[in-house]
Swiss-Prot record:
The organism's taxonomic lineage, starting at the top: Bacteria, Bacillati, Actinomycetota, Actinomycetes, Mycobacteriales
Name of the featured protein: Uncharacterized protein Rv2248
UniProt GO cellular component terms: plasma membrane
InterPro entries: Restrct_endonuc-II-like (IPR011335)
Native organism: Mycobacterium tuberculosis (strain ATCC 25618 / H37Rv)
Gene3D superfamilies in UniProt: VSR Endonuclease
Amino acid sequence: MTRQQLDVQVKNGGLVRVWYGVYAAQEPDLLGRLAALDVFMGGHAVACLGTAAALYGFDTENTVAIHMLDPGVRMRPTVGLMVHQRVGARLQRVSGRLATAPAWTAVEVARQLRRPRALATLDAALRSMRCARSEIENAVAEQRGRRGIVAARELLPFADGRAESAMESEARLVMIDHGLPLPELQYPIHGHGGEMWRVDFAWPDMRLAAEYESIEWHAGPAEMLRDKTRWAKLQELGWTIVPIVVDDVRREPGRLAARIARHLDRARMAG
């Protein structure tokens, strides 16, 4: 097939151009894009940064570009491909191909992000169970002296694999930065009839809980009704629920922390 015929196929939707000179019948997933990249470069690409994080299941940043280690050969500049030199990076096989090791990847991604997203990455890495805290600590030591490593090292003691979303991680960092008592994460509350509900953040002794409310979670009236019913039952058990939304976390963190602090103070006084 000539280049002109290929261009016509792409224009008509019969083919998808994955990389220069490499086509697919349909839009490939991440592994498909990496396999096509192998064809494009004539070798095996080694994934790193967000691409490696996605392979391990802890990419909190929805990485679109493909990030790979420098293969040591000249490559044609290509949109959507980022090539990196990473001396000393540990490698591991995942989904049938090489990538930077999970702990190394988590630290490398974290040290390039703002603190809230860095904590989200460390939380997600622990939650994925692809690496242990001790392995992340070792990776921090291995990357000492590199840009952003001090912030990553300072955040690591607060990383917690129980966090279920990146925004929960961001909200928790607000609490940490404002000196609030650390909450229990995904805390189970049991009802009188044997029911069990989990709350994102809990201070059990104070019977205070906080819940991050995402737009996606309340996509319709059924979801909203479910949550309102749940909250009512928790309140019947004597719990106070503090709702948290994205603007609380990113635009008014001080007010959010003060609101939680007031509820904690009231609970102490009542107790």
